[in-house]
Amino acid sequence: MVGFAEVIRALGGDSDSESPLHGVSSSTSPKPQTVSFLRKWTTDSARLLEENPQTLFIVPPEGADATRENAVAVANPRLAYALVVRDFLQGDLPATLSPMAFISESAELADTVSVGHFAVIEDGVVVGPGSVIDHHVVLRTGVRVGSNTRIGSHTSVGGRGFGFEMDDDGRPIRIGHMGGVLIGDHVEIGSHCAIAQGTIEPTRISDHVKIDDCVFIAHNVFVGENSFIIAGAEISGSATIGRDVWISPEAAVINKASIGDGALVGIGAVVIKDVEDHTIVAGVPAKPIGHRPPR
């Protein structure tokens, strides 16, 4: 059983508390035997700790002198809280393959992969250790998923992209897509997303990318490491998204555009030309409005 003392020591503090830890609570409604965090130290913070001795608080450095057996001061309380929840409260769930999923005999799934109900994993798909394929996910032939990656319910990866060429009679002829999709390690893809496979070369989602629900990523797109793409965004074909980029909700990026490292695209922006590194753009069409400092 996890206790306050174990968590406090893991965060660099010292405690002999015997209180057990069973869950989480907010700082506005603290509950016994839970962990909470304070973003800022205010004049009321010390009283909050004193009145709730059975709640474990993670506080900013300004609260170090007032910490008690139920508190620990760290540089980044929100990050420390996230690590405590991950490492002490959530834990690793056992890998399970739903009997109601379709998994091709030629698919390669590591032993620690989990697959939910009614998921479809087609021929030749590769999924790395620790990854979770949620209910109703479809992974088409040509998809490779790295380790410790999670794909949310009702997401389709590797479907054919939207590309046509007109014949001599002016009729649209679909261009076959055979490039597949490469998804890196520690990627999170939300529910109801669609990621199209590349035409010839793969669509690529790099390590540690975080994609929210209801995002569309077209064929041949490249998304760099540590980038965030938020709900409702649309990335058109052959666009390049750099490292540490933030694409806000409902933003759209035109085909073949390049978004530089560290850039931020504002809510509902329509990007019709390249965006330089660490530039903030917003509006329709998107225009530079500021500078985003490197992290």
Language-model-detected regions and their locations in the chain:
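Structural signal for interior beta-strand "rungs" in well-ordered beta-sheet cores
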Residues: 37, 96-282, 286-289
